[in-house]
Amino acid sequence: MTAALTVRGATKRFGPVLALDEVDLEVQHGEVLAVLGDNGAGKSTLIKCISGVHRLDAGEIEIDGLPVHITSPAAARAHGIETVYQDLALFDNLEPAANFYAGREDAGPRWLPRPLRVLRRRSMADATVELLERLQVSLPDHAATVGLMSGGQRQVIAVARAAVFASKVVILDEPTAALGVRESRRVLDLILRLRAEGHAVIVISHAMDHVTEVADRAVVMRRGRKVGEEIPSPDSQERIVALIVGTSG
């Protein structure tokens, strides 16, 4: 089976610091892959290279088995990769539909120059409601601005927005950080629904119980290198922690 995303020999330096050292990684369609590691392990650098924030110094990235050159976030999105960072990048003064389509507004008629086109607000709002219903995301008021919503509601909006435009891979950076039990549950359920719809999902997380629940595989990084891989389960948690802190073997 051809992987949705394959990374081979990913290497990245920042001056004298070797942030990524020949990292290999792959994730299949309909799979949740957790990338684990302590602070400074290279997790964030890896996803930023996949997302086009940083350029790899060496190595290659493939989408569905085909080499791609990801030189910017726009290039990553063009290849079907969407990333949700911890800050979510939502506009607090806009409602969910406007956040979904920010920078990708549906406007027409198409034969007019872009500055003269009229926003199709009703179409965007209806499409947003339809998507949220498909993903079983419930919001108290679709017309409310996201700044008035809870942390969990904001997180599921950001994840759902990524799912709208990600044809291949959704990357989630600490998706349950600072959320309560109920709000974390909403996000975890959404991750499982993304997997069921065939998305390849990469999750960066320190929450081992959440990783055990939703991830099919876990890759462990330390000091810029991939040091191991495990199937997350209660039985493997001790081995995963040993890989993270460097006491395995």
Task: Label each region the model flagged.
Residues T2-G249:
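Glycine-rich phosphate-binding loops of nucleotide-dependent enzymes
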